[in-house]
Amino acid sequence: MKKYRLIAFSLLLFLFCSCGQEKIENSGNEGLVPAVPSGIVLTEAGNDFLSFSWEASENATSYAWKLLKGMTLVKDGSSTECAVNVNGLEEGCSYSFAVRACRGEKLSAYSPLFEATTLKSEGGENPNPGPEPGPEPIEDVYEKMMIPAAEEDGIARAFPGAEGGGMYVTGGRGGKVYHVTTLEDSSSEGSFRYAVNQKGPRTIVFDVAGTITLNSPLQIKNGDLTIAGQTAPGDGICIKGRYTNITANNIIIRFIRFRLGDEDPNVSDSDDAIWGRYCNDIILDHCSMSWCIDECASFYANENFTMQWCILAESLRSSVHSKGDHGYGGIWGGSNASFHHNMLAHHDSRNPRFDHPHIYEDHNTVPNRGVIDYRNNVVYDWGSNSSYGGEGYGAGKGTGINMVGNCYKPGPSSTDRKYFMDAYGVYAKCSSCGSNIEEGYPLMYMSDNLHSKYADISADNALGIYWHNGEAHANYGITADKPFAVKGPSGESCKVTTHSSSQTLRQVCDWAGASLSRDAVDRRVAEHALNGSGKIIDCVSSTSGKVSVADEYGFTWPLLRASDEQKAIAATDSDGDGIPDYYEALFGLDSKDANDAKSISLDKNGRYTNLEMYLHYLVKEIVAGGNEGGSYQTLD
């Protein structure tokens, strides 16, 4: 058997894997969730085997690993050492390896996929190769889909794992499929902008990986749309250069990065990475937003809205904004609006800013202002302020804010803020009326919120409200004794998986953002939040006297790539129905029948089309990992 041994194999094992020859000792930290393994290296490769090692993870007692071909599981196993040898593989074949750390029932997220290829025989490639064989159809397809057990109630969500006020959005269900085949920003077919600008129910899938630099703002003005970022091969998709604005109803956006940046000379004061208001039925899931001029992601005045499992990080504090220092997280609000399992990190303020009536175009007719459910979010390393505002939430029947299970953790940039909410009863900046306006304090339901610095307000959340304008305003000193109900568009009960505040930081750091293949930005921000490091950023590129991404971290825009095999799998879709031939074979579908993507044959409960089941299959482990350890609750 031919073998290939990497140079300094023993040295690598010593440097990267000091635990490779010893069992992991029990450190006594049984209750701690171990860190995600890092430092994966290929230590040896042969015709039919691959050997991997990795750095020891803090608090780990063992490791679980898996090897995939494409997205199909080939081998898996466990080890008490930081190394594994995987045998019985095909020669000259590309594989993806991932490993997670374990401590009893406590599991980290899987590491990013590490690509490796077995060697070919001395004779080289077969001069007359036959067609590449497709995968064997998997048995028990429905069980392999890992639909969350709590969702086996016969009710269709926007997708398996969709929760909160936007959980019943339908997006592009049953509609046309558009393939993104180029990273160029144009109005031509094959571009992302072209697909977004089409009308009618539609789903956008990606045959390419990389960064799309917008030449002008991207307006999502035609609804009934699903943007399935998880279909992109390899490292996925990033949108940069100009802002994205949602002005349409019935929108699903998943696994996309929106990193605005300050390099385009046309960016302006009001530019967010992505934002939207005055719309209905929107859900953003596992997206990453950063490097904005104004806010990373502002969504308010929307009805039946969810932002879940997103990372909003590193707004630019001292970039091109005409007011000088800025750099904010977001303005959040709405009616039946859910914000859960998100991270706000390294923002000077608006972490978030709960909206007020005078932010609307006509504050005398305030649309879509009702119940906000703010749950299991992480607020880390705020600058001048953390969460504040909310004027008038509680002034009308059925309005209020649920604050449940959130984690507030100061960082190196943080001023001392001994509260979860700086509640406002007066709006004090009304340029059109010239005086302060009484709105009343927000009425809030507070439960199980955690401040890492102040145990007293963690024990009694009512002490964690700072009444900004003093006593002489409605709702002063009052908190709700039960949570406010969140309802769907037809009055249906909305549901959400809730974790304890002590779980929130780890769950969000492990699973939030465009986490199918995390880029260096999200990995860095998650590490900052876990270990208490990092800082607020002024700008992207090196600028004298300012804190830049380039100077602090030695890079700016992560290079997003895909292997040839990953690109081939994503792009080979003979019938153009959005399900690549590889997965049609895997699921026992027909790659020459475009209609089977719209059919409902894979879901035994008749809820999701085959295309939707495929979209879930790509991220099923992420959905399961995020839900793990939580309680599925009805918001009523």
Q: For each predicted feature, which ranges?
A:
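Pro/Thr/Ser/Gly-rich low-complexity, intrinsically disordered linker/stalk tracts
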Residues: 24-59, 91, 109-124
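Beta-strand-rich modules
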Residues: 88-106
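Acidic Gly/Asp/Thr-rich repetitive segments characteristic of extracellular carbohydrate-active
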Residues: 157-204
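Right-handed parallel beta-helix
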Residues: 212-336
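Extracellular beta-strand/beta-solenoid scaffold signature
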Residues: 239-244, 265-275, 291-299, 320-334, ...
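Extracellular beta-rich repeat passengers
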Residues: 353, 358, 371-555
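Extracellular calcium-associated, cysteine-rich motifs in secreted modular proteins
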Residues: 556-636
